[in-house]
């Protein structure tokens, strides 16, 4: 009798169009992210149903800066972080927090436009055309130990300069950096896409350089909190959906600049970032097709942060990265 009732129930659900993988049958995961073009795989996976098809109900939690996402992941307020690799994240892991960096979410890469250093219209009119021209001037970042702080320090070193040669100004959030630049309250800031294109197109600032052309760098990653690392089936399911989303982005937008699927991705990014598609199309960031992490770069980051007093102790990349989830998901999906 019980089997008959179960069979009738399942048939009834099918007949009225309710999928058997409806929300009560999914694993809910909270993912913390910024509303940036480099979050495209997350947008794609949500809107195209890749996560649901792998048994994951994804709940996005939006932030205005990267470091608070690391904190939220460490405390268990979110399950997945999708943002920049910061000193705050590394310190959390160094202090015993069980966070695992597992996949790529965006690289600074030659020929691709993710992060730019911009100068105010006043500075541009005054003739600023090189980083050396900003000696003694204010450069806005989100927070001390942020990805922007790392980028600035490395770019200055390439010019034979140091962080002591400029005035580093923590402004708290990306939106604050944008607004401060547009209003000419600061000489220079870093911004990510699609804000870079929108600011330049709107006359609010001028691009001094694209970071990827000067500093190949694993700027952002997917990382798992402790609860998710202990729930391996859910962790693998998330990763499979994420890799599928990376492939869709790579095949239909990053390496293809026309057609319905290309426009679809621009529309998805526009929907979630609230920026216009024409600005987004000007510069799509590089993300590996399989979401593969540039592991050798993490050690370089750890060494730099420690050298500059932003890490509490010297650390190894092996303490940070766990590729086992990515490798297993990739094996199940096939290349």
Q: Regions from the language model: what does each represent?
A:
Residues 1-10:
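Bacterial N-terminal signal peptides that target proteins for export
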Residues 9-19:
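Bacterial N-terminal signal peptides
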Residues 20-25:
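Sec/Tat signal peptide C-region and signal peptidase I cleavage site
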Residues 26-162, 168-171, 187-193, 208-210, ...:
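Short, glycine-/small- and polar/acidic-enriched structural segments
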Residues 68-70, 88-89, 176-180, 195-196, ...:
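Short, hydrophobic alpha-helical packing/hinge segments within bilobed ligand-binding/sensory domains
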Residues 107-116, 202-227, 239-242, 322-331:
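Periplasmic-binding protein-like
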Residues 230-312:
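Secondary-structure end/capping motifs
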Residues 299-335:
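Conserved C-terminal helix/tail region of periplasmic/extracytoplasmic solute-binding proteins
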């Amino acid at each position: 009798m019980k089997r008959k009732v179960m069979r009738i129930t399942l048939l009834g659900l099918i007949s009225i169009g309710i999928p058997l993988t409806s929300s009560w049958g999914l694993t809910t995961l909270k993912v913390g992210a910024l509303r940036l073009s480099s979050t495209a795989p997350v947008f794609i996976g949500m809107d195209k149903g890749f996560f649901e098809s792998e048994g994951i109900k994804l709940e996005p939690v939006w932030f205005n800066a990267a470091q608070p996402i690391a904190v939220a992941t460490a405390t268990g307020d979110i399950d997945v972080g999708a943002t920049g690799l910061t000193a705050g994240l590394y310190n959390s892991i160094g202090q015993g927090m069980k966070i695992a960096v597992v996949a790529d979410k965006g690289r600074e890469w030659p020929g691709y436009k993710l992060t730019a250093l911009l100068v105010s219209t006043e500075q541009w009119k005054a003739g600023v055309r090189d980083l050396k021209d900003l000696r003694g001037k204010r450069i806005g970042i989100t927070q001390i130990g942020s990805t922007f702080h790392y980028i600035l320090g490395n770019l200055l070193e390439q010019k034979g300069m140091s962080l002591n040669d400029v005035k580093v100004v923590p402004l708290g959030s990306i939106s604050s950096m944008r607004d401060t630049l547009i209003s000419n309250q600061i000489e220079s800031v870093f911004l990510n896409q699609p804000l870079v294109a929108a600011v330049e197109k709107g006359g609010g600032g001028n691009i001094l350089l694209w970071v990827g052309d000067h500093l190949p760098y694993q700027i952002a990653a997917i990382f798992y909190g402790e609860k998710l690392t202990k729930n391996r089936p859910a962790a693998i399911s998330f990763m499979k959906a994420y890799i599928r989303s990376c492939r869709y982005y790579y095949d239909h937008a990053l390496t293809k600049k026309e057609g319905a699927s290309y426009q679809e991705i621009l529309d998805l990014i526009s929907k979630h970032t609230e920026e216009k598609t024409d600005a987004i199309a000007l510069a799509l960031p590089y993300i590996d097709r399989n979401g593969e992490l540039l592991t050798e770069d993490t050690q370089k980051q750890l060494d730099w942060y420690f050298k500059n007093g932003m890490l509490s102790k010297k650390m190894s990349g092996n303490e940070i990265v766990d590729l086992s989830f990515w490798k297993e998901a990739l094996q199940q999906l096939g290349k």
